[in-house]
Curated annotation (Swiss-Prot):
The chain crosses the membrane at residues 86-106, 116-136, 649-669, 686-706, 717-737, 771-791, 809-829, 837-857. This is Probable mixed-linked glucan synthase 3. The gene is CSLF3. Its EC number is 2.4.1.-. Coiled coil: none annotated. It comes from Oryza sativa subsp. indica. The active site is at D211, D573. It is a multi-pass membrane protein. The keyword Disulfide bond does not apply. Keywords: Cell wall biogenesis/degradation, Glycosyltransferase, Golgi apparatus, Membrane, Transferase, Transmembrane, Transmembrane helix. May catalyze both beta-1,3 and beta-1,4 glycosidic linkage on beta-D-glucan. Essential for (1,3;1,4)-beta-D-glucans synthesis in grasses and cereals (Poaceae). The mixed-linked glucans (which are not present in walls of dicotyledons or most other monocotyledonous plants) are particularly important constituents of the walls of the starchy endosperm and aleurone cells of cereal grains such as oats, wheat, rice and barley. They can account for up to 70% by weight of the wall. The keyword Transport does not apply. Belongs to the glycosyltransferase 2 family. Plant cellulose synthase-like F subfamily. It is an enzyme of class 2 (transferase). Pfam families: Cellulose_synt.
Length: 868
C-alpha cells in the first residue's frame, strides 16, 4: 500500500507550499464547500476506505523493480477496486433481483385478472419498462474503479532540478452567456482561481468566452488582470486554498500552511481590502461605461453612430452596445479576440497596477501571471450560433492560434478551482504510462458550495457523481459532464487514438475551415510532445483570430459534427463524450481528497427543474439522432454502449411513474378496485422487488462512500422530476419530432449573495410554471386519497373482512410512500413557511381528518338520499 502522500498527492509546490494532504489543510476542509460530504463518510478521494483495495500492486511493483530504466513514464495514479466481500454480494443481489423481476413478469402475464383491464395493461407495460431501465442502469455498475492521482510521482517526473518542467501546456476555457443571469463577480472569481492555480505560468493560458459580446465583461476582465497581480503572488507566497477570493474570504478561520506566517496576517488584511475595492470597481462598471459613452457621444464626432458604446481607449466597442443597433446587438456583432495578458515570456501588455505598491514583499515569489484572453465569437442572425458548443469551438480555434496547448480544460463561469493542484491531478492521467496516450479526457466530480445544508433538491447528486461515475470508470470511462473536464486537443479534433490512428494525417480545410494558421496549428498539435511559445500578436494575426471566431467560419466544415464539441443538441457534453468514446478513446474519473472544483447550483425548485428539462430533453434528442447509442459509436465497449443507452431513454420512465402516482384517485370509487388479482400476492411481489433494489442501493452506498440521506434525496428528487421535468422533456421531444424545433436553451439564473442577506433566499421562493401542475395534482390526489381511505375505514370498519382491511392498509402505505417522496415539493409550496417544517407535520394530519370527515358526511348524506 502506498503512503498517504503518494495516494492523495503530496510533495511541495514551487513556492514551498505543503502538500494537500497536510493535516492542517485537510482538517480545515470542514469550513469550505464539500466538507460536510467528506465528514459524512464519502467523497471523492477516500482511497483507503475499508471497502476499497489497491488494484495495481503488481504494476507498481514491476515499475519499482525497473526503476525507470526502460525510459517509460512512471505510474502517475493509483487504482482501487471494491473488495470482494462487498462486490460479490452486490453482484449476486443484482442477479437475484433480475430473476425475481422475470418471475414477477411471468406471474402477472399468467394472472391477467384486474378490475380495470386497460390499467392492468398499462401497468404491465410500465413494470416491463421499469425492469428494462433498471437493468440498463445496473449492468454498467458491475466493476467500479476509483482512480487517485499521484502528485508526488508527477512532481518527481516533471519538476526538474534546474527549475524547468516537463509538464505539457494547458488551455483553460471559461464560458459565460450573459452578465445578468451569470453575475460578473462569479465569472471573475473563476478566472482568478485559474490564474492562481499551481501550474507553470508559461505552460497555461486562460480564455474567457463572452457570448453576450458585452463591454462590461471585457473591462471586468481587465480589472481582474490588475487585481491578479496582487492576488496570484499572495496565493503562491502563502499557499492558500481555495484560490477564489470570494470563497477564501468567506472562511471563518482559514488554516495556514505557508512558510511566512508572521507576514500572513498583514498581507491578508491588505489583499482583503484590495479585493473589496476590486468588487466596488466591478459593480461600478455599468455606470462607468454608460457615462463614458455619453461623454464621447456628446462630442458629436464623425465616428459612427451617435449612441455607440465606447471603450476606455476612446474607440467604439465592436460588440454589443448599451443601446443596441444592427451589427452591435446581442446575437449580431463581430467576433472579438483581445489578449488581456500576453504570454509571460514577453511580459504583460497592460499598464497594470504594481502589486509592490501595497507594501507586500514578493521577493521570493514568482509574480508572473498566465496568458489571459477575451473571446467573443461573432454572431449573425443568418447563422446558427450553436449555443455553448459553438462558444467552446470558437475558443478551441482561437487558442489553437495563440497557445495551441496539448490539453484543454473547460469551466462554466460559476465554477472555480477549489484545489490548486487540480490541473496537475488531471495531467497525472494523461501522462501515465498505462493508458495515458489513449485517454481523451479526464472528468472531475461536480461539487457545490451554495447548496442548503439538507440538500432539499438533491443538487449534490452524489449517487451519480460518487456511484455511477466510479462504475463507468471501470468500463471505457465516465461521460463528459460539461464542466471540470480536461480534454486532449487531438481527441476534440476528431483524431483517432494511437492504436487506430493513420500515419501522415493531413488536416483539410473542408474539415477544419479555411485558415492556413489553424491548419498549421493542427499539424503542430499532432506532435504531442512539443511545447510552442505563442507567436507575437500583430495586426495580421489579430485579423486571423477574428476570422476563426466569426459567425460563418464553421459553415460547411466538420466543426460541430466530427470536430470539436457537437452541435444541434441540448446536451452537447454527453454527445461530445459519446463521439470521442465511439472512436475508441477512453476517459478517466479523477477524485481528490480535497475537492478539485466547486461551483454554484440552482437551489430554487423551478430553476432546478428547468435545468433538468434541458438535460433530459437533450438525452431524448440524442436517442432520436444519428448519435443513438444503438447504432453509433463503432468502437464502444458493450457495457459502455448500455450506459449511454440508459442516459438517452431514462426520461420515458417518468410516464409510468406518473401513472402509478396518480392511481390513488381510485380511492374515490365507492367499490373496491384492484389493479391486479390476487392482490395480496401482487403486493408481496412488489415489496420483495422494492426491498431488493434498496438492498442493492445499500451496498452501493457502502462502496460509494455516501450516506442514506444522499440516497433518499436522490429518490425524492427523482419522483419530483418524474412528475414534472421528465414528462415535460418527453412532450418537448414529441413536439421536436413533429416540428423539428429543438429544446430551448435557457441559462440557469444564479443568485448572488449580494442580492440578499439570506444565502438560501432562492430556496424559499416558489415560482409557479406549468410543468409543476402534474406534481401538484399527484400531491393533492394522494392527500385526498389518504383522507378518503381514513373515511372509508371509519365507515366500513365493521363491514370489511380481514383481507379488505389488509388491502386498504397496503394501499394506504403506498399513498404515504408517495407523500414522503414528494415532501421536498410540499416544502417548496410553503415558501418561507418551510423554514418551520413542523407546520407541515401538523397541517397534513388536520387535512387528512378534514377530508375524512367530508367523506363520512357525504357518505351519510348520500345513503339517506340514495339507498344502497
Amino acid at each position: 500500500m502506498a503512503s498517504p502522500a503518494s495516494v492523495a498527492g503530496g510533495g511541495e509546490d514551487s513556492n514551498g507550499c505543503s502538500s494537500l494532504i497536510d493535516p492542517l489543510l485537510v482538517s480545515r476542509t470542514s469550513s469550505i464547500g464539500g466538507a460536510e460530504r467528506k465528514a459524512a463518510g464519502g467523497g471523492g478521494g477516500g482511497a483507503k476506505g475499508k471497502h476499497w483495495a489497491a488494484a495495481d500492486k503488481g504494476e507498481r511493483r514491476a515499475a519499482k523493480e525497473c526503476g525507470g530504466e526502460d525510459g517509460r513514464r512512471p505510474l502517475l495514479f493509483r487504482s482501487y477496486r471494491v473488495k470482494g466481500s462487498l462486490l460479490h454480494p452486490y453482484r449476486a443481489l443484482i442477479f437475484a433481483r433480475l430473476i425475481a423481476v422475470l418471475l414477477f413478469f411471468g406471474w402477472r402475464i399468467r394472472h391477467n385478472n384486474s378490475d380495470i383491464m386497460w390499467f392492468w395493461t398499462m401497468s404491465v407495460a410500465g413494470d416491463v419498462w421499469f425492469g428494462f431501465s433498471w437493468l440498463l442502469n445496473q449492468l454498467p455498475k458491475f466493476n467500479p474503479v476509483k482512480t487517485i492521482p499521484d502528485l508526488t510521482a508527477l512532481r518527481q517526473y516533471c519538476d526538474l532540478a534546474d527549475g524547468s518542467y516537463r509538464l505539457p501546456g494547458i488551455d483553460v476555457f471559461v464560458t459565460t452567456a450573459d452578465p445578468i443571469d451569470e453575475p460578473v463577480l462569479y465569472t471573475m472569481n473563476c478566472v482568478l482561481s485559474i490564474l492562481a492555480a499551481d501550474y507553470p505560468v508559461d505552460r497555461s493560458a486562460c480564455y474567457l468566452s463572452d457570448d453576450s459580446g458585452a463591454l462590461i465583461l471585457y473591462e471586468a476582465l481587465v480589472e481582474t488582470a490588475k487585481f491578479a497581480t496582487l492576488w496570484v503572488p499572495f496565493c503562491r507566497k502563502h499557499c492558500i486554498e481555495p484560490r477564489s477570493p470570494e470563497s477564501y474570504f468567506e472562511l471563518e478561520a482559514p488554516s495556514y500552511t505557508g512558510s511566512a506566517q508572521e507576514e500572513f496576517k498583514n498581507d491578508s488584511r491588505i489583499v482583503h481590502l484590495e479585493y473589496d475595492e476590486f468588487k466596488v470597481r466591478l459593480e461600478a462598471l455599468p455606470e462607468t461605461i454608460r457615462k463614458r459613452s455619453d461623454v464621447y457621444n456628446s462630442m458629436k464626432t464623425d465616428q459612427g453612430a451617435p449612441n455607440a458604446t465606447w471603450m476606455a481607449n476612446g474607440t467604439q466597442w465592436p460588440g454589443t452596445w448599451i443601446e443596441p443597433i444592427e451589427n452591435h446587438r446581442k446575437g449580431h456583432h463581430a467576433g472579438i479576440v483581445k489578449v488581456v495578458l500576453d504570454h509571460p515570456i514577453r511580459g504583460h501588455n497592460l499598464s497594470l497596477k504594481d502589486s509592490t505598491g501595497n507594501n507586500l514583499n514578493f521577493n521570493a515569489t514568482d509574480v508572473r501571471i498566465p496568458m489571459l484572453v477575451y473571446v467573443s465569437r461573432g454572431k449573425n442572425p443568418n447563422y446558427d450560433h450553436n449555443k455553448k458548443a459553438g462558444a467552446l469551438n470558437a475558443q478551441l480555434r482561437a487558442s489553437a492560434l495563440l497557445s495551441n496547448a496539448q490539453f484543454i480544460i473547460n469551466f462554466d463561469c460559476d465554477h472555480y478551482i477549489n484545489n490548486s493542484q487540480a490541473l496537475r491531478a488531471a495531467i497525472c492521467f494523461m501522462l501515465d504510462q498505462r493508458e495515458g496516450d489513449n485517454t481523451a479526457f479526464v472528468q472531475f466530480p461536480q461539487r457545490f458550495d451554495n447548496v442548503d445544508p439538507k440538500d432539499r433538491y438533491g443538487n449534490h447528486n452524489r449517487v451519480f457523481f460518487d456511484g455511477t461515475m466510479l462504475a463507468l470508470n471501470g468500463l471505457q470511462g465516465p461521460s463528459y459532464l460539461g464542466t471540470g473536464c480536461m480534454f486532449r486537443r487531438l481527441a476534440l479534433y476528431g483524431i483517432d487514438p494511437p492504436h487506430w490512428r493513420q500515419d501522415n494525417i493531413t488536416p483539410e480545410s473542408s474539415k477544419f475551415g479555411n485558415s492556413i494558421l489553424l491548419l498549421e496549428s493542427v499539424l503542430e498539435a499532432l506532435n504531442q510532445d512539443r511545447f510552442a511559445t505563442p507567436s507575437p500578436v500583430n495586426d495580421i494575426f489579430v485579423n486571423e483570430l477574428e476570422m476563426v471566431v466569426s459567425a460563418s467560419f464553421d459553415k460547411e466544415t466538420d466543426w460541430g459534427k466530427g470536430v470539436g464539441y457537437i452541435y444541434d443538441i441540448a446536451t452537447e457534453d454527453i454527445v461530445t463524450g459519446f463521439r470521442i468514446h465511439g472512436q475508441g478513446w477512453r476517459s478517466m474519473y479523477c477524485t481528490m481528497e480535497h475537492d478539485a472544483f466547486c461551483g454554484t447550483a440552482p437551489i430554487n425548485l423551478t430553476e432546478r427543474l428547468h435545468q433538468i428539462v434541458r438535460w433530459s430533453g437533450g438525452s431524448l434528442e440524442m436517442f432520436f439522432s444519428h448519435n443513438n447509442p444503438l447504432i453509433g459509436g463503432r468502437r464502444l465497449q458493450p457495457l459502455q454502449r448500455v450506459s449511454y443507452l440508459n442516459m438517452t431513454i431514462y426520461p420515458v420512465t417518468s410516464l409510468f411513474i406518473l401513472l402509478y402516482a396518480i392511481s390513488p384517485v381510485m380511492w374515490l370509487i365507492p367499490d373496491e378496485v384492484y389493479i391486479q388479482r390476487p392482490f395480496t400476492r401482487y403486493v408481496v411481489y412488489l415489496l420483495m422487488i422494492i426491498l431488493m433494489i434498496h438492498m442493492i442501493g445499500w451496498l452501493e452506498i457502502k462502496w460509494a462512500g455516501i450516506t442514506w440521506l444522499d440516497y433518499w434525496r436522490n429518490e425524492q428528487f427523482f419522483m419530483i422530476g418524474s412528475t414534472s421535468a421528465y414528462p415535460t422533456a418527453v412532450l418537448h421531444m414529441v413536439v421536436n419530432l413533429l416540428t423539428k424545433k429543438g429544446i430551448h436553451f435557457r441559462v440557469t439564473s444564479k443568485q448572488t449573495t449580494a442580492d440578499t442577506n439570506d444565502k438560501f433566499a432562492d430556496l424559499y421562493e416558489m415560482r409557479w410554471v406549468p410543468m409543476l401542475i402534474p406534481t401538484m395534482v399527484v400531491l393533492v390526489a394522494n392527500i385526498g386519497a389518504i383522507g378518503v381511505a381514513i373515511g372509508k375505514m371509519a365507515v366500513y370498519m365493521g363491514v370489511w373482512t380481514i383481507a379488505q382491511k389488509r388491502h386498504a392498509i397496503m394501499g394506504l402505505l403506498f399513498n404515504m410512500w408517495v407523500m414522503f417522496l414528494l415532501y421536498p415539493f410540499a416544502l417548496a409550496i410553503m415558501g418561507r413557511w418551510a423554514k418551520r417544517p413542523i407546520i407541515l407535520v401538523v397541517l397534513l394530519p388536520i387535512i387528512f381528518v378534514i377530508v375524512a370527515l367530508v367523506y363520512v358526511a357525504t357518505h351519510i348524506l348520500l345513503a339517506n338520499i340514495i339507498p344502497f
